Regions:
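Structural signature of the two symmetry-related core transmembrane helices
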Residues: 199, 219-237
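Hydrophobic positions within alpha-helical transmembrane segments
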Residues: 189, 269, 300, 304, ...
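Loop-to-transmembrane helix entry/capping segments in MFS-fold secondary transporters
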Residues: 1, 33, 183-184, 263-264, ...
């Protein structure tokens, strides 16, 4: 959660730093972005310094230390049980590869789309989505709304309700300040995924909490399979919005005849892909932690991140397809991969749920 709160502000900060380097320092667009990377590098160093400076304040929650005299009993598994669990985890890792390959197109083809195909300007209500402070206000309203219904005391309900009203008033005032159109740069789209993660987490918890109370909550493997289907739906939005568009190569050569589409296609896609991420990522890590044989838990958790790394490496497939192939075909490749992965998960479901 904290990671995504920071990620929400990062795109706006990067764009502002780049604009400062261009307008104030006089650097070209091709050179100005280096300043954003420089600030990111410095920020990482500062983050590490903060971590080590204040490490003593959270040392009590760090793992890896065993108290003197502590007798920790590990679950004993037969060789057959160990093999079944390892095989099940490897099957999940195989699916995870294709999810991250598709999901992390947000750093490649989806950004290409934002840069080359999406409209460069936005106006009206839509333009408000590109202001990070509007997104922060919506997040506050979501959490305040949940607090209003879940709080036990009248005072807490009142405070939560006032926060919702204050947020609505702020957004209304911001709308009155909208005039004309604003410029939209490709990097700013990266704020939508962390925004959706932070805003939708309480919604996700409420849904699955309600299902759990009714004893109808899907198992972790089923959630992963559903996540692959939802990811396919996200790219289906892109495929539908790309019908009839020029190929990226033709778009570059078209000049004034170039075709641009509404930013809403990307904004909607990021929403659906975030739902997929919420279904798959935390559930997958939880599944690995629960199913991994005790003596192999560290290795199996490493396997999850190896699968993530392989998926990130395969993101390049989108780059190979970008340029001369119709866009709807590019997105269809990821639709097919996600659907095949979901079918594979459902085919292996009994084996996966047996060890879960």
């Amino acid at each position: 959660m904290a990671f995504n709160i920071g990620a929400l502000f990062a795109p706006t900060a990067a764009v502002k730093i780049k604009e400062y380097a261009e307008t104030v320092l006089g650097y070209s667009s091709n050179d100005a972005y280096h300043f954003s990377f420089a600030v990111a590098c410095a920020s990482l160093i500062v983050s590490m310094a903060i971590y080590y400076a204040f490490r003593s304040t959270f040392k009590h929650v760090e793992g890896g230390e065993r108290k003197a005299g502590a007798d920790i009993k590990e679950e004993e598994l037969t060789p057959e049980e160990t093999k079944a669990r390892v095989v099940a985890l490897c099957l999940v890792f195989a699916v995870v590869i294709f999810f991250w390959m598709a999901f992390h197109q947000n750093g490649l083809t989806l950004t290409y789309f934002a840069d080359e195909i999406s409209a460069k300007t936005s106006e009206g209500v839509q333009s408000m989505a590109f202001d990070v402070w509007n997104l922060v206000t919506i997040i506050i309203m979501v959490y305040a709304g949940f607090s209003c219904f879940q709080s036990k005391t009248a005072k807490a309900k009142l405070i939560s309700g006032l926060l919702v009203l204050a947020g609505a008033a702020f957004l209304g005032w911001k709308y009155t300040q909208v005039s004309g159109s604003i410029d939209v740069s490709a990097p700013i789209y990266q704020q939508f995924n962390p925004f959706y993660v932070v805003a939708l987490t309480p919604v996700s918890l409420a849904i699955f909490g309600s299902l759990a109370a009714k004893k109808k909550e899907p198992s972790a493997p089923r959630k992963i399979a559903y996540g692959m289907i939802v990811a396919a739906a996200g790219f289906a939005i892109m495929a539908f919005g790309s019908f009839g568009l020029l190929t990226p190569d033709a778009q570059k050569e078209a000049g004034d005849a170039a075709m641009f589409v509404s930013p809403n296609w990307l904004i909607s896609t990021y929403l659906v892909l975030t739902f997929a991420e919420l279904l798959l990522s935390p559930m997958g890590i939880s599944f690995v932690s629960k199913v991994a044989p005790p003596k192999l838990k560290g290795m199996m958790m490493g396997g999850w991140f190896v699968a993530t790394a392989v998926g990130n490496m395969l993101v390049r497939v989108g780059g190979f397809l970008w340029g001369y192939i119709p866009l709807w075909i590019v997105w269809s490749v990821f639709i097919v991969l996600c659907l095949l992965s979901a079918i594979f998960m459902f085919a292996m479901m009994k084996r996966l749920e047996k060890v879960a």
